[in-house]
Amino acid sequence: MSTSKTVKDYIRTIVDFPHEGIMFRDVTTLFADPRGFRMAVDQMLHPYAGQRIDKVVGLEARGFILGGAIAHQLGTGFVPVRKKGKLPGATISQEYKLEYGEAVVELHKDAIQPGEKILVVDDLLATGGTAGAGIKLIEKLGGEIISCSFIIDLPELGGRKHLQSLGMDVHVLCEFEGL
C-alpha cells in the first residue's frame, strides 16, 4: 500500500467557516508545504506541456499565488483579474452574480493582446461565476483561452458545467463533495 500523498491530502477542511454549514477547503496548508505546492503547480501545468501559452491569468486572490508560480515555470507573463477598484490605470470590467447580489471584476485594458493564448488559474471552482467573468474579460480583449485549471472542484455547485457551457476546457486536480 502506497503512502504517497496526493494534492488533496495537503488541503485542510475547516468546518463551519465562514458560516455554519460551510466546509471551507483551505489551500494555505498546501501552499505552505514545498512538496505539496510543487506537486500542485506541476500537475496544473502537465496537461499543457508543449502547448503555446503566452500569459497566465490568475483570479483574485489565491489564483495570484498559483498564477505567479505557473507563469514562472512557463516563462510567460502573469495577469491578475481583480475585484473592482483594485487595479490602477485603464481597465475593463465584468459583472457576475453571487448567491446574494452581484460583484465586479476588472482587467487592465492593455494586459492581453488579440490572439494571445491564455491559461486561466485559480484554487477553487464553485459556481464558476468569477472564472466566467474573467473569461469574458479575456475574450473582450481578444485573448484565446487554452484552458481553465483549478486545484479544487466542488461539483455540487456546477462550476465545471457552467464553464464547459461557455466552451471552456476545464482541468481540476481534485474534487470535494459538500459545500
From Swiss-Prot:
InterPro entries: Ade_phspho_trans, PRibTrfase_dom, PRTase-like, UPRTase/APRTase
Annotated EC: 2.4.2.7
GO CC annotation: cytoplasm
Subcellular localization, as worded in the UniProt entry: Cytoplasm
Keyword match Protein biosynthesis: no
Keyword Translocase found: no
BP-aspect Gene Ontology terms: adenine salvage; AMP salvage; purine ribonucleoside salvage
Pathway(s) served: Purine metabolism; AMP biosynthesis via salvage pathway; AMP from adenine: step 1/1
Domain of life the protein comes from: Bacteria
Chief location bin: cytoplasm
Pfam families hit by this protein: Pribosyltran (PF00156)
Keywords (A to Z) from UniProt: Cytoplasm, Glycosyltransferase, Purine salvage, Transferase
Catalysis: reaction(s): AMP + diphosphate = 5-phospho-alpha-D-ribose 1-diphosphate + adenine
Entry GO MF terms: adenine binding; adenine phosphoribosyltransferase activity; AMP binding
Protein family (similarity comment): Belongs to the purine/pyrimidine phosphoribosyltransferase family.
Annotated function: Catalyzes a salvage reaction resulting in the formation of AMP, that is energically less costly than de novo synthesis.
Record text on subunit structure and interactions: Homodimer.
Record-linked PANTHER family: ADENINE PHOSPHORIBOSYLTRANSFERASE
Protein name: Adenine phosphoribosyltransferase
Source organism (scientific name): Ruegeria sp. (strain TM1040) (Silicibacter sp.)
Source organism phylogeny: Bacteria, Pseudomonadati, Pseudomonadota, Alphaproteobacteria, Rhodobacterales
Encoding gene (name): apt
